Amino acid sequence: MASGDDSPIFEDDESPLCSLEKMTDLVAVWDVALSDGVHKIEFEHGTTSGKRVVYVDGKEEIRREWMFKLVGKETFFVGAAKTKATINIDAISGFAYEYTLEIDGKSLKKYMENRSKTTNTWVLHLDGEELRVVLEKDTMDVWCNGQRMETAGEFVDDGTETHFSVGNHDCYIKAVSSGKRREGIIHTLIVDNREIPELTQ
């Protein structure tokens, strides 16, 4: 079983039963939030067969059979930006194993902490659809449900506005100074002249 800060989230009742039947050696599941969406990473480790299988969003990325060395690592890529991910397999005692996930060379926990400083995320419902809007603060790229949006920047009296459209809805992210050095710039999503609360991660 997995342990540590980067331990997986185990299968819940919402997952289809057929995927559990198919994945008989499923040992770890992680949900990873990237700019283009939340990706589910599943790992099968057959400690008697030597099998290792990595699935990203239900699609098989890596399959290795008859691996005689049961510890090691598997490296693959996740999401539209091809973010590097590595699953580390370590023996902790006897036939017990620990599975940890690294994203861009950092533990999942450290990566998510860093990401919360470099991105803002909003979730809202528009026209009966759930939308996930992500602002990458370092590049000012805006993503909506996995698509990088066409944007137009505009300077205004109290800061900047980054405009984009979702369907027939006018949206913009307003950036204003907090006036406090430690807080920095405050980003606010406005959709149809309505402020959307930020998702806290």
UniProtKB/Swiss-Prot annotation:
It holds the Pfam family FAIM1. InterPro entries: FAIM1, FAIM1_dom_sf. GO terms for cellular component: cytoplasm. Its main location: cytoplasm. It is found in: Cytoplasm. One of its GO terms (biological process) is negative regulation of extrinsic apoptotic signaling pathway via death domain receptors. The keyword Lipid metabolism does not apply. Keywords: Apoptosis, Cytoplasm. Plays a role as an inducible effector molecule that mediates Fas resistance produced by surface Ig engagement in B cells. PANTHER family: FAS APOPTOTIC INHIBITORY MOLECULE 1, FAS APOPTOTIC INHIBITORY MOLECULE FAIM. Belongs to the FAIM1 family. This is Fas apoptotic inhibitory molecule 1. It comes from Rattus norvegicus. The lineage of its organism: Eukaryota, Metazoa, Chordata, Craniata, Vertebrata.
